[in-house]
C-alpha cells in the first residue's frame, strides 16, 4: 500500500490540476488535467482510479510541403512561435484565471524525441514555473502515451504496443517498471511510413501515415499483395529493408520501368500494381509483423488484453488485424484511442506527470530539467502502479 497523495493539493483543495507541455517532434501540445484528492479505493493502483478529467487539450502541428520531412531547427522555431498562445488558449478553455493559485504542477516532455524541439518546450516550462511559482515534473514521452491510453480505455494490465514516428515497442508492466519485451532494431514504423510518403510525394497534412492509410483503402488489387521483406527476430523486428525494397518499387513505377516484372506484365507490358497497391502491401506487411510480436508477448506474460498507443495506433487497419488475432485468444480484447489521445498531445504529459507528482516525484533543481533524446521506457520507476 502506498500513500496516493504524498504531496497534498494547493490551498487545501480537494483536487489537483496539472499543465502538460509536449513537443518531442512536430506536434506541439498543451493539456490540462484534473484529479480528485483521493481515488475511490485508497488501496488501489493510482493510475487506474485517478478519475482524470480533461480540462483542455490544444495542439498545433508543424507541417512541411509534400516530399519533405521536418528538420529539428525548423520544428523548434514552430514550437517557440506557438507555445505561448497555446498555453493561453488552454488556460482560457480550462477557465483558469490564476495559474499561481490553481495549477499544482507543470509537466513537460523530458524525452525521448528531437533535441531542439524538446529544448524549446522545456524552456517554456521553466519560464512558466518561475512566473507562477509552480513545481516541475519531467515526463517520459512513452510513459505519457501508456498512461493516457490506460486512463481512456481503462485497460487493467495489458500488453502495450507503442507505435509512433520515433518508437516501436512491445511493453508489459512488471514490478514498478514498464518492461520492453520487443522493439525495432532500426527505424520506427511511423518513420518508415513517413519516409515512404516522402518518396510518393503525398501531402504531410494531416499526417503522412494517415494519407498512406487512405490510399491503402483504395487499393484496386488487394488480392495481389506485393511481396516485401518480412523481418521478425524473436520479439524484435526490422523495417529498414522493407522501406528500401518498396522505395525501389515506387521509383520504378514512377519511371515506368517495364523491366520490373513485379509492377508490369512481362508479356503485355501493362501496369499491374498501383501506388495504392504499394501502400496496401506495405501496411499489411508491417502490421502483420506487429501482430506477431504482440501475440508472442501476450503468450509470454499470460495476458488477454492489448493496448495500442502512439500515432500509428490510430490506424483502423492495424486495430482490425490486432482484433482478429485477439479473437483466437480466450477473452481477447483490443484497446485503442482516437486521434485526440493517440497522437502526441499535452494531456498525456499532464496525466503521467500528475501521477508522478502525487507520489512525490518533483524536480528539485532546474539542473534536473535537462532533456534527453534517448530516454528508455524501462528507465522510469512507476511509483503510482500497484
UniProtKB/Swiss-Prot annotation:
A biological process term (GO) from this entry: positive regulation of transcription by RNA polymerase II
Cofactor(s) listed in the protein's UniProt record: a divalent metal cation
UniProt feature coiled coil, ranges: none
GO terms assigned for molecular function: chromatin DNA binding; metal ion binding; N(6)-L-threonylcarbamoyladenine synthase activity; nucleotidase activity
UniProt KW Transferase keyword: yes
Keyword Transcription regulation (UniProt): yes
Residue positions binding a divalent metal cation: 141, 145, 162, 344
Record localization: Cytoplasm; Nucleus
The entry's keywords: Activator, Acyltransferase, Cytoplasm, Metal-binding, Nucleus, Transcription, Transcription regulation, Transferase, tRNA processing
InterPro entries: ATPase_NBD (IPR043129), Gcp-like_dom (IPR000905), KAE1/TsaD (IPR017861), Kae1_archaea_euk (IPR034680), Peptidase_M22_CS (IPR017860)
UniProt xrefs under Gene3D superfamilies: 3.30.420.40
Reactions that this protein is recorded to catalyse: L-threonylcarbamoyladenylate + adenosine(37) in tRNA = N(6)-L-threonylcarbamoyladenosine(37) in tRNA + AMP + H(+)
Assembly description: Component of the EKC/KEOPS complex composed of at least BUD32, CGI121, GON7, KAE1 and PCC1; the whole complex dimerizes.
Miscellaneous field: Present with 1270 molecules/cell in log phase SD medium.
UniProt name for this protein: tRNA N6-adenosine threonylcarbamoyltransferase
Species the sequence originates in: Saccharomyces cerevisiae (strain ATCC 204508 / S288c) (Baker's yeast)
